[in-house]
From Swiss-Prot:
Primary role: May operate as a cation/H(+) antiporter.
Stored InterPro entries: Cation/H_exchanger_TM, CPA2_transporter, Na+/solute_symporter_sf
GO biological process terms, semicolon-separated: potassium ion transport; proton transmembrane transport
Highest rank taxon of the organism: Eukaryota
Keywords associated with the record: Antiport, Ion transport, Membrane, Potassium, Potassium transport, Transmembrane, Transmembrane helix, Transport
Membrane topology type: Multi-pass membrane protein
Subcellular location: Membrane
Annotated source species: Arabidopsis thaliana
Ranges that cross the membrane: 19-39, 44-64, 79-99, 112-132, 143-163, 179-199, 201-221, 240-260, 294-314, 323-343, 352-372, 389-409
One Gene Ontology term, aspect cellular component: membrane
Any GO MF annotation of the entry: antiporter activity
Gene: CHX1
Protein name: Cation/H(+) antiporter 1
C-alpha cells in the first residue's frame, strides 16, 4: 500500500481506510466493554466476558449498512489479522515474563496429568462425532487436518482468558488459581506443538524451518540475557531502563515473531519461551514488567477479547446448522468436564475444586482462532459455514464457561477464600507467603535480612516453598491526592508531574539494589509492590493487599529506628498509629520488626557468619504463632535457634521426654518439662510436638527458665540481651504471672509487655526484636487511638 494512502483513500467519499476504522473499532470495544463490565462486575463476572460481549454488540451493529461499510472495508481482514498478531505477541511475551515458575515446577505432575486427561477424553468423545460431522458438512478431503483443527480448536483452553479471569476474581495468588493458569498454559502449548508437528509432516518443508527458528530463538534468549545484565550498567543511577532500551527488546521479539509467521508457522510458542527464559531479577526485568503490564492488561487484552466477539457471526448458518452447533458446544464442555474430573480424581485434588477447574479450562478463543486463520492452503474444507460455526462455538463456550464459573465462585465463596491466615497449623513443606512493608532503604535492609532468614538457605538441601513480597510504602502528600494516576508515579524523576524525590521513592534505587543482591545470592525472587496512599488510609490498603496476595503474615517496621550512635529516634507517631490500625484490621498474622541493624540482626546472604536467634515462649496463641514462624528458621544453616521457655516457679511439672539429642553448633541446655495439667493444654501439646520434631533432632536448642514474677523475667532478659542478635516473641499472653508488673512502665502497647521491654532504648538489649500477633477477629488490648 502507498504510504500516502495509509490513512486516507483517494476517493472523495471515503474519508477513512481500514487502519483508521480499526482504531475506532478498538475505541468502541473499550467503551462498550467498560459499560458491560460496570453492570456485570457486581454479579461476579470477569472482564473477558464483558469484552467479548462488547465485540458481539459491535458485530451485530454491522447489520446496519453504513456501519458495515465503515468497519468492513476492502483489505480490513488483513489489517485485523496483522494487528491481532501484534497484540498476541505482546501479551504472550508478558505471560512468559509473569508466570510463576516455582509453582509450575512444584505442580508439574498435576498440570501434565490434567492436560493429558483433558485432551485424551476430548479426543475420544470427538472421534464418533467427527464421522457424523464430515458427512453433515460434506467434507471431501483433508480429513486429517479437519480433525486436527477441530480437536485442537474445541479441546483447547485459551490461556489469556484464563489468566485475565483469574486475576479479576483475585485468585491469581491462590493455589487453585495458579493451578488453573498452569493447566491452561500446558494445554495451549501442547496443542500448538501437536499442530505444528503434524503440519510440518504434511507439508514436508517446515521441519527444517522449525529447527532453524528454534536455534534463532535460542540466540534471542542468550542475547536477552546479555542485554539484561549489560544495559543496567550503562546508567546505574537510574531506577529503570530508558524507553529506547526497552524498545530494543520489543523489536528483537517482533523480528523473530514476524520471521516465523512469514514461514506459515505459529510464533506463539517461540515468543512464550523467550519470555519464560528471560532473567527474572534486576533492573531490566522490573522495567519490562512496569512498562508492559499496565497497557497490556488494560488495553491490549480487552481489545483482543473484543475482537473475538466481533468475529461472531451466524449469517451463513441455517436452522440445521444450529443443531450441530449445539451438539458441538455440549460435547466440547462434556469432554473437558470428564477429562478434568478424571484427572482431579487421580491426583486427589479436593472435590470442591473439580467443577471450577473443568469450567475454567473450557474457555476458548486464542489459539483456536489463530489456527483457524492460518495455513489455508492445507484446508480444502474451509468454507464460510465452517468458519462461522467454529467461531460461534468458541464464543458461546467461552461465555458459558465464564458465567458458570463465576456463579460457582459466588455459591462456594468460602471454599476459595484465603484460609491460611496464621502459621500454627502450617508445615514447612507448604508454601509460606509473607509481605514485608518498608518506607525506605533503612527498613528494606532489615526486612531483607528477615526474608533471608526465613528463606531456609542450607547448602545441599531443598528449600521450602517461599514467596516473599516487599511493599514500598509511600505516603502521598495531600496536594497530590487527585492529580496523578498510579502508573504515572513510576515515570522518570524528570517527570513534570512529580518524580521519585517528591513521592518518597528517591531511595527506590537502593531498595532495588538490595533486593537484586539477595536474589542473586539466594535465587529467590522477591516480588515488589509499590503502595502510594495518604497516610490516614494506608492501613486499609495494606490490609487489602494481605488478602489479595494471600499472605500468612505481614511484617511492619517499628516507628523508631536506631541511629549510628546506637540511640533510638522516633520517626513519627503517624507511623505508630498506622501499625496499630493494621494490628486491629489485618486478616492475617502480623509481625512488628524492631530493627537494630547496627548491633542486632544483620543480612545473612553474602556472608558465612552464623547468627543466634532466641524464641521466647511464655504461652498463649501469639507465642505459639511466633514459635511457628521460627520453624522456617530451622532450615537455615546460618541461623542457630534457641527456644527459651519461661515457666512459673510455682507450677507443678513432670518429665515427659528423655534427654535431648544435639548436633554440632546446636546445644540443648535442659530437658523439656511439660506444664501441669492445670496449664493450657494447647500450649503443652504444641510445645511437645515442636520439641520432638526439632529439638530431639538437634536442629534447635532449648532452655527452660523458672520465674515467679515480672521482675525475675526482666532480670533474665537483661542477662541474655547480649547473647542473641534477634528475639522472636508473641505480643499478648493474657494474665500471665511471669510478666506481672512489667506493664507498669510500658511505652508501646502494640509490642506487648515483653516486646516493649526488649525494644526499649533504656534497657541493655542490643538485639533486633520481632513481635508476632496471631490473626484473630477480636481485640481487647489496645489503647484508644
Amino acid at each position: 500500500m502507498d504510504p500516502k494512502m495509509l490513512f486516507c483513500l483517494p476517493e472523495g467519499d471515503a474519508l477513512f481506510n481500514p487502519l483508521n476504522t480499526m482504531f475506532i473499532q478498538m475505541a468502541c470495544i473499550l467503551v462498550f466493554s467498560q459499560f458491560f463490565y460496570l453492570f456485570l462486575k457486581p454479579c461476579g463476572q470477569a472482564g473477558p466476558v464483558a469484552q467479548i460481549l462488547a465485540g458481539i454488540v459491535l458485530s451485530l451493529l454491522t447489520i446496519i449498512r453504513k456501519v458495515h461499510e465503515f468497519f468492513l472495508q476492502k483489505d480490513s481482514a488483513s489489517y485485523y489479522i496483522f494487528f491481532s498478531f501484534l497484540l498476541r505477541t505482546a501479551f504472550v511475551f508478558l505471560i512468559g515474563l509473569e508466570i510463576d515458575l516455582d509453582f509450575m515446577k512444584r505442580n508439574l505432575k498435576n498440570s501434565i496429568v490434567i492436560t493429558l486427561g483433558s485432551l485424551v477424553i476430548s479426543g475420544i468423545i470427538w472421534l464418533p462425532f467427527l464421522w457424523f460431522l464430515i458427512r453433515f458438512m460434506q467434507i471431501k478431503g483433508d480429513f486429517l487436518t479437519f480433525y486436527l483443527a477441530f480437536l485442537i480448536t474445541l479441546s483447547n483452553t485459551a490461556a489469556p482468558v484464563v489468566i485475565r479471569s483469574i486475576i479479576d476474581w483475585k485468585l491469581h495468588t491462590s493455589e487453585i488459581g495458579r493451578l488453573a493458569i498452569s493447566c491452561g498454559l500446558f494445554i495451549e502449548i501442547t496443542n500448538i506443538f501437536i499442530y505444528t508437528i503434524v503440519l510440518s509432516f504434511i507439508s514436508g518443508t517446515m521441519t527444517a524451518d522449525i529447527f532453524i527458528y528454534s536455534f534463532a530463538t535460542g540466540v534471542i534468549i542468550l542475547t536477552n540475557r546479555f542485554l539484561a545484565s549489560w544495559l543496567p550498567k550503562r546508567n546505574p543511577k537510574e531506577k529503570y531502563l530508558s524507553k529506547a532500551e526497552t524498545l530494543a527488546f520489543i523489536i528483537l521479539i517482533l523480528i523473530i515473531a514476524l520471521t516465523i509467521e512469514s514461514s506459515n508457522l505459529n510464533s506463539t510458542l517461540f515468543v512464550f519461551i523467550i519470555g519464560l527464559m528471560f532473567p527474572r531479577e534486576g533492573k531490566t526485568y522490573r522495567t519490562l514488567i512496569q512498562r508492559l503490564s499496565y497497557p497490556i492488561h488494560e488495553f491490549v487484552l480487552p481489545v483482543y477479547f473484543g475482537y473475538i466477539g466481533f468475529r461472531f457471526s451466524v449469517n451463513s448458518l441455517t436452522k440445521r446448522h444450529y443443531l450441530v452447533l449445539g451438539m458441538t458446544v455440549a460435547l466440547s464442555l462434556l469432554g473437558k468436564l470428564l477429562g478434568v474430573l478424571f484427572a482431579c480424581s487421580f491426583l486427589k485434588i479436593p472435590k470442591q475444586y473439580w467443577l471450577f477447574l473443568s469450567t475454567m479450562l473450557s474457555v476458548k478463543g486464542h489459539i483456536g482462532l489463530v489456527l483457524l486463520d492460518s495455513n489455508l492452503m492445507y484446508k480444502k474444507w474451509f468454507t464460510p459455514v465452517v468458519h462461522d460455526m467454529f467461531v460461534a462455538a468458541l464464543v458461546i463456550m467461552t461465555l458459558l464457561s465464564g458465567v458458570i464459573t463465576s456463579l460457582l465462585l459466588r455459591s462456594q465463596e468460602k471454599s476459595f477464600a484465603h484460609i491460611k491466615t496464621s502459621l500454627e497449623l502450617f508445615d514447612t513443606t507448604e508454601e509460606l507467603r509473607v509481605l514485608t512493608c518498608v518506607y525506605g532503604v533503612r527498613h528494606a535492609r532489615g526486612s531483607i535480612s528477615l526474608v533471608s532468614a526465613l528463606s531456609g538457605f542450607s547448602p545441599g538441601t531443598s528449600s521450602s516453598p517461599f514467596t516473599p513480597y516487599l511493599m514500598h510504602l509511600i505516603p502521598l502528600p495531600k496536594k497530590r491526592k487527585t492529580e496523578l494516576l498510579y502508573h504515572e508515579l513510576d515515570e522518570d524523576a524528570g517527570n513534570s508531574n512529580g518524580g521519585d524525590d517528591e513521592f518518597g521513592t528517591n531511595e527506590g534505587l537502593e531498595i532495588n539494589d538490595s533486593i537484586d543482591s539477595f536474589t542473586r545470592d539466594r535465587k529467590i525472587m522477591v516480588r515488589q509492590v509499590k503502595l502510594v496512599a495518604p497516610m490516614e488510609n494506608m492501613h486499609e490498603e495494606i490490609c487489602n493487599a494481605t488478602e489479595d496476595l494471600r499472605v500468612s503474615i505481614v511484617f511492619l517496621p517499628f516507628h523508631k529506628h536506631q541511629r549510628i550512635d546506637g540511640k533510638t529516634t522516633n520517626d513519627g507517631e503517624v507511623f505508630r498509629h498506622m501499625n496499630r490500625k493494621v494490628l486491629k484490621q489485618a486478616q492475617c498474622s502480623i509481625g512488628i520488626f524492631v530493627d537494630r541493624n547496627i548491633t542486632g540482626f544483620h543480612q545473612l546472604h553474602g556472608s558465612d557468619s552464623v547468627q543466634h536467634v532466641a524464641a521466647l515462649f511464655f504461652g498463649g496463641p501469639d507465642d505459639r504463632e511466633a514459635l511457628s514462624l521460627c520453624k522456617w528458621l530451622t532450615n537455615n544453616s546460618q541461623i542457630h535457634l534457641t527456644v527459651i521457655q519461661f515457666v512459673a516457679d510455682d507450677s507443678k511439672t513432670e518429665k515427659i521426654v528423655g534427654d535431648a539429642v544435639t548436633k554440632e553448633n546446636n546445644e540443648v541446655f535442659l530437658e523439656i518439662v511439660s506444664e501441669d495439667q492445670t496449664e493450657n493444654e494447647t500450649d503443652r501439646i504444641f510445645l511437645e510436638e515442636f520439641y520432638h520434631r526439632f529439638v530431639t533432632t538437634g536442629q534447635v536448642g532449648f532452655i527452660e527458665k523458672r520465674v515467679s514474677n515480672g521482675m525475675q523475667t526482666l532480670t533474665i532478659l537483661r542477662e541474655i540481651g547480649e547473647m542473641y542478635s534477634l528475639f522472636v516473641v508473641g505480643k499478648n499472653r493474657g494474665d500471665c504471672p511471669m510478666t506481672s508488673g512489667m506493664n507498669d512502665w510500658e511505652e508501646c502497647p502494640e509490642l506487648g509487655t515483653v516486646g516493649d521491654f526488649l525494644a526499649s532504648s533504656n534497657m541493655d538489649v542490643n538485639a533486633s526484636v520481632l513481635v508476632v500477633q496471631r490473626h484473630r477477629n477480636s481485640f481487647d488490648s489496645f489503647v484508644d487511638e
